[in-house]
């Protein structure tokens, strides 16, 4: 297999990557390209779908150029993507009728709020496993159909198509031949019935979204179509695996057994537990979602979404310029000598699970005249660990399963100080993946399995290499005191609600 490889297209919130893996799961090529973010109004976040497509083509080309690998050597392509982000495009021209509305965007919040006010929150939760929120695709589709002239009528005539990023890229790579999504991405739309495994007619009627614009839903590991030769340098290569980024990371962490939990520290942080072949509906504001469907079976998951994680470190660097780079934050935390009396609650876009408070805003507590730059940076890092504990504690309540080990990956997982504090505040062993590219690797595994590049899950397990572990060192009294302080800070943050004065409005 040395002359054959698997490519993963990892389309994230701020950049796109094309990564080529060999049979041992080693990364042999990696090309990355950022693309613009658009903020038309406060709280709105949009992308240009064609800029994403161009970034994908560019990274594919660069991966081949830099590695010397030929397109014909690629056995299969896996796609993993930022979830929920919504695109509606013209079926004939392939042109989007509006920018992609990003998962972070709050412009559709009034639609979600009206659904809750009208009493539909429980129905949506029971059918989809999700809370009713602007985070998911359903309200974004409705907003586009409402705000683009003639869009509703065109959608009803079958002239428009909807897709999350996976569907858009698959449609483009196959030259418009394949309009398909996978179980994991469908389960994040707030339109998919996770019990029946089909689009939910009641919710479609409720939101007046025409079923004709929705993609076919298929498993996470199968051949959906082949690249057009003009998009892949003369080669028609199977696109053979797809999964939303957090489910791909779960698969890349080889979390095949129920009760296995992983946390990916990216722009946000996403804690996901494999709950097996039956959906476990949360009583505590976690999301019930589909982990992956493979080999005729569907595996479900509980998920806690934290909106701000790595972006808090970016804020330290770019927003208030307390650090020059992400590694500086670890050095600063080690140099802090206070008694952890400072708490930063980074609710820059509200609070995610388990609070789901879209009106909360970031806050700081415990400042004194003696507080230093290092103390503030340390408190910001600690917020990532505290938020993770919020979700893990909730996950244990919902599932009834103890969590002896938390598998971690993502950029902030490189921070040894943070990982040790995470172990301490959870009183749980932290296992950092040897290969932190678990999202792309999960997509590659799904793609490779369906084309026979890897034979089965056992072969993947046999290749697993453990990473670095962090064991708890903090005493129970200190752990309890610190977490109680965090809980008090969150409660105080939720009390403060104020609309700023804007002159002229």
From Swiss-Prot:
Family matches, as InterPro entries: ATPase_NBD, Carb_kinase_FGGY, Carb_kinase_FGGY_CS, FGGY_C, FGGY_N, Glycerol_kin
Positions of glycerol binding: 83-84, 135, 245-246
GO BP terms, alphabetized: glycerol catabolic process; glycerol metabolic process; glycerol-3-phosphate metabolic process
Keywords (A to Z) from UniProt: ATP-binding, Glycerol metabolism, Kinase, Nucleotide-binding, Phosphoprotein, Transferase
Maturation and modification: The phosphoenolpyruvate-dependent sugar phosphotransferase system (PTS), including enzyme I, and histidine-containing protein (HPr) are required for the phosphorylation, which leads to the activation of the enzyme.
KW ATP-binding (keyword) present: yes
Control of this protein's activity: Activated by phosphorylation and inhibited by fructose 1,6-bisphosphate (FBP).
Residues annotated to bind ADP: 13, 17, 267, 310, 411, 415
EC nos: 2.7.1.30
Family classification: Belongs to the FGGY kinase family.
Full protein name: Glycerol kinase 1
Gene source species: Lactiplantibacillus plantarum (strain ATCC BAA-793 / NCIMB 8826 / WCFS1) (Lactobacillus plantarum)
Lineage: Bacteria, Bacillati, Bacillota, Bacilli, Lactobacillales
Gene this chain is encoded by: glpK1
